A protein has these predicted regions:
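Hydrophobic alpha-helical membrane-association signature
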Residues: 9-16, 52, 87
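A structural preference for short, pocket-lining loop segments at secondary-structure junctions
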Residues: 12-43
Length: 229
């Protein structure tokens, strides 16, 4: 269908978030978990879908401002792209497994608009180096990497709900400073292995091939933890 966000789906999610916001401090939910597996907006409902995305983002900000953490869990075959990727980035914390991918423009979209020379969507290794879960986790684009079982996601969510940062100006300022420093250190890198090598990650060319257990022993880049999330 080209995505999962249309008028009806967007309205349902928006209603869920507003109900959580209105229940803050009155016995409502203590957290909101979004299980995202989406390419973004349904192409058949482009305008309605884009409007739904913007309203959902606004609602997430309201829920977080009310003191309720919003967690994104990404691990399906579609990942979280387009508006779904932006929604993911707005959450308090993000949990991914090896098959999860998070990005704004999907590989096919980039290839269609810029050509295969710019981005080959069929190059699986390239796609995972750019927007795959391991790249996102090491660089701070996500907050927790799990092995992929339901129980793994559940345990990670329970921990992260308790450590979600407040949604306030100092948090956003600290996050902007972190991103500025990341751009300064790695802005001239052309591929993920260059970033890992510069950051001191051992054998960066093998990141995609090692087991989850081995990957989880790797030290993240200093300053990778998100302040805004």
């Amino acid at each position: 269908m080209g995505g999962a966000f249309g008028e009806v789906h967007g309205a349902k999610l928006l209603g869920l978030l507003r109900a959580a916001r209105d229940g803050a401090g009155r016995g409502g939910p203590r957290a909101v978990l979004l299980l995202l597996d989406t390419g973004g907006v349904r192409l058949q409902e482009a305008n309605a879908g884009e409007l739904a995305i913007s309203e959902i983002i606004h609602a997430i900000v309201q829920v977080r401002s009310a003191g309720i953490p919003v967690l994104a869990l990404v691990g399906g075959r579609s990942g979280a792209f387009g508006g779904g990727g932006i929604i993911t980035a707005c959450c308090s914390r993000i949990i991914v497994s090896q098959h999860g991918r998070v990005s704004v423009s999907g590989p096919e979209v980039i290839e269609t608009n810029k050509g295969v020379e710019e981005f080959d969507a069929k190059d699986r290794a390239l796609v995972w180096r750019v927007c795959g879960a391991r790249t996102r986790y090491l660089s701070g684009g996500t907050d927790r990497y799990v092995k992929g079982g339901i129980e793994d996601y559940r345990e990670a969510a329970i921990v992260l709900v308790k450590h979600a940062p407040p949604f306030a100006l100092p948090t956003l300022t600290a996050e902007q400073q972190r991103l500025t420093e990341r751009l300064r250190r790695f802005g001239d890198c052309r591929d993920a292995p260059e970033i890992w090598r510069k950051a001191g990650v051992p054998e960066p060319e093998r990141i995609a091939d090692i087991t989850d257990d081995t990957f989880l022993t790797i030290q993240r880049i200093q300053g990778a933890d998100h302040d805004a999330r």
